[in-house]
UniProtKB/Swiss-Prot annotation:
This is Protein FixA. NCBIfam families: PRK03359.1. CDD domains: ETF_beta. PROSITE patterns: ETF_BETA (PS01065). Belongs to the ETF beta-subunit/FixA family. The gene is fixA. Pathway: Amine and polyamine metabolism; carnitine metabolism. The lineage of its organism: Bacteria, Pseudomonadati, Pseudomonadota, Gammaproteobacteria, Enterobacterales. GO terms for molecular function: electron transfer activity. GO terms for biological process: carnitine metabolic process. Required for anaerobic carnitine reduction. May bring reductant to CaiA. Heterodimer of FixA and FixB. It comes from Salmonella newport (strain SL254). It comes from the Bacteria. Keywords: Electron transport, Transport. Gene3D superfamilies: HUPs.
Length: 256
């Protein structure tokens, strides 16, 4: 059984600044980290490995120069995966879901797999699209919002998905893609032994050409900017008479 767990390197949100001149986001001083939601995907894959005994877990990511960071690679591998595959190219800097999914699908197809696990979304965009788009690209079953993995055999996966007023139990044939919610587990903190052992695990670095990806995206992000701040009018209405109430209602109408 070969399980691929996908993750994304995202900027640490506490280090992102806003350029006052044009409202664009400045990532120059922001360190990269594993997207918080993808930690659940990594943990889910490694728990399955422990249950099955003979499974192999491969961590996989698509991105830009952040994936060249040795510390980041060690962080991923210290959490349990046996191997790491990264697809690196400038075109994947701040890639949109369709671009990321196309590259992940091509890389997963080259690597081979039985089950591919994603987080429900990424910490930066949280579009919640990549897992389903990967399934579509590979023409295999895909389920998002998975809150529990009930069973996994050589041919079938059974999971639970919590909806607003019910819990679904779903079974799908392998190979398949699932996107797990944060309810599925609590990611473990790597031990010192695991951190030291991570440096010995294999890492494969691929380019778009290595996975046969030459397509030009149909759309691209032109700019990412913070919304313009509007000054408050600071309208103060004193009193509780009919005129004051009418003025209050009129001001409410203007903003609704």
């Amino acid at each position: 059984m070969k399980i691929i767990t996908c993750y994304k390197c995202v900027p640490d949100e506490q280090d992102i600044a806003i350029n006052n001149a044009d409202g664009t986001l400045d990532f120059s001083k922001a360190d990269s980290k594993i997207s918080q939601y993808d930690l659940n995907a990594i943990e889910a894959a490694c728990q399955l490995k422990q249950q099955l005994g003979d499974a192999q877990v491969v961590a996989m990511s698509v991105g830009g120069k952040a994936l060249t960071n040795a510390k980041g690679r060690k962080d991923v591998l210290s959490r349990g995966p046996d191997e790491l595959i990264v697809v690196i190219d400038d075109q994947f800097e701040q890639a949109l879901p369709q671009q990321t999914a196309s590259a992940l699908a091509a890389a997963a197809q080259k690597s081979g797999f039985d089950l591919l696990i994603c987080g429900d979304g990424s910490s930066d965009l949280y579009a919640q699209q990549v897992g389903l788009l990967v399934g579509e690209a590979l023409n295999i079953p895909a389920i998002n919002g998975v809150s529990k993995i009930l069973s996994l055999t050589d041919s079938t996966l059974t999971v639970e998905r919590e909806l607003e007023d019910e819990v679904e139990t779903l079974s799908i044939p392998l190979p398949a893609v699932i996107a797990v919610s944060t309810d599925i587990n609590t990611p473990q903190i790597p031990s010192m032994k695991a951190i030291l052992g991570a440096a010995k695990k294999p890492v494969q670095v691929w380019s778009p050409a290595d996975i046969g990806l030459n397509s030009v995206p149909a759309y691209s992000a032109q700019q990412v900017a913070a919304p313009k701040q509007r000054e408050r009018q600071r309208v103060v209405i004193e009193g509780d008479g009919e005129e004051q109430i009418a003025a209050f209602v009129e001001n409410l109408r203007k903003i609704i």
